[in-house]
Regions:
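Low-complexity intrinsically disordered segments
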Residues: 13-16, 92, 96, 180, ...
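Soluble ligand-binding/transfer domains with enclosed cavities or grooves
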Residues: 53, 59, 80-87, 92, ...
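Residues that act as N-cap/strand-start positions at coil-to-secondary-structure junctions
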Residues: 11, 18, 49, 81-83, ...
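Flexible, membrane-facing loop/turn or short amphipathic-helix motifs
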Residues: 61-70, 76, 106-116, 140-149, ...
Length: 201
């Protein structure tokens, strides 16, 4: 774990990164999302058994209804906000593995989709100077669909931290699942998202 904490202290804590605008489709093209952000990592704290670090995100995210001609019609939802999340990780003596959680702390704005959402973090490893970890969201969160409605979804993702030319890179590659809110069963969603790649300037 010391190598991972050293990596976080040297390469991640105190860094600010930017995600260029990217576009994704929802509901088989009925909606279109446009996203960009600024991410800052700070407040790294650690003990003999674990560590935590905060992630501040200033995001600009809008979801549009798409008309029959494939053009943006009406703004369905504006998720733009300033949010704070926290990674909390610890070493497990039973397996010598690092596990923990990634959770929402606070945000500006109303009806924040990540509010009260927690993800489990596992498979944390440092390979060839790349810090990798896997995320699996607990339960479900809301995702806007047509006609002013929402559907329950959950995400699984891979996170990667690495440096190129002295600049920190952070990659988030997520997969969306539709969730049966009664049974909590998941099935692959038709909604797909490109990898989010944030780079320090």
């Amino acid at each position: 774990m010391k190598k991972i904490i050293d990596f976080m202290e040297e390469n991640v804590d105190g860094r600010t990164l930017f995600t260029k605008e990217l576009v994704y489709e929802l509901e088989n093209g009925a909606l279109q999302g446009v996203y960009s952000d600024q991410i800052s990592f700070s407040n790294l704290k650690y003990s003999q058994s674990g560590f935590q670090i905060d992630m501040f995100i200033v995001s600009n995210e809008k979801i549009w209804l798409i008309d029959k001609e494939g053009q943006r019609d009406k703004l369905r939802k504006d998720f733009s906000s300033v949010s704070m999340f926290r990674f909390e990780l610890a070493m497990r003596k039973s397996t010598n593995a690092i596990t923990g959680c990634f959770r929402f702390i606070s945000a500006s704005g109303k009806n924040v989709p990540a509010e009260a959402v927690v993800s489990g973090i596992y498979d944390v490893r440092l390979e060839n100077s790349v810090l990798k970890l896997s995320e699996s969201q607990v339960l479900y969160r809301d995702q806007p669909i047509q006609d002013g409605r929402y559907k329950p979804v959950a995400f699984q993702a891979e996170h990667r931290f690495y440096c190129e030319d002295g600049k920190l890179h952070y990659e988030y590659d997520g997969r969306c699942f539709d969730v049966d809110a009664k049974t909590m069963q998941r099935r692959h969603s038709s909604d797909t998202f490109p990898p989010f790649i944030s780079i320090e300037k």
